[in-house]
Amino acid sequence: MEKHILVVDDSPTIRSSVAFCLHNAGYKVTEAEDGQDALEKLESMRESVHNLAMIITDINMPRMDGITFIEHVKKSHFRFLPILVFTTESEKSMIQKGKEAGASGWVVKPFQPEQLLWAVKKLVWA
């Protein structure tokens, strides 16, 4: 079965490049523009929770930031999913907050496709 990943980022460019990279590696991707949009998409996936392999999320987003989104996910029936956090060099201080909220790993932006795929494989196949 194809592994399904939810990608959450307010930048359409980042979402598209991540989706392209993941599609080329054989993953199915659903995109969300912020934490609120992602929660709505997760709710619509409730019946197929076992088809979702992981979540990749940005930290700084409008409406609902990544930390708040992670906290919501970890209190839901999706709590078992690994969550990979995107952060920029200037946001590295947020890594600890992400870990405390329940993130499983992180990738610093800008990233190379190989870095992203290595981090994804490490979490999906763990």
Residue ranges and their predicted role:
Residues 40, 67-79:
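Short amphipathic alpha-helix used as the core "switch/output" element in two-component signaling
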Residues 33-37, 65-68:
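Acidic catalytic/metal-coordinating carboxylates
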Residues 61:
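Receiver (REC) domain active-site loop signature in two-component systems and cognate sites
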Residues 16-24:
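Charged docking surfaces used in two-component/phosphorelay signaling
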Residues 109:
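A Lys-centered signature of the CheY-like receiver
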Residues 68, 90-105, 115-118:
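Alpha4 helix (beta4-alpha4-beta5 surface) of REC/receiver domains from two-component response regulators
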Residues 46-56:
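Active-site beta3 strand of CheY-like receiver
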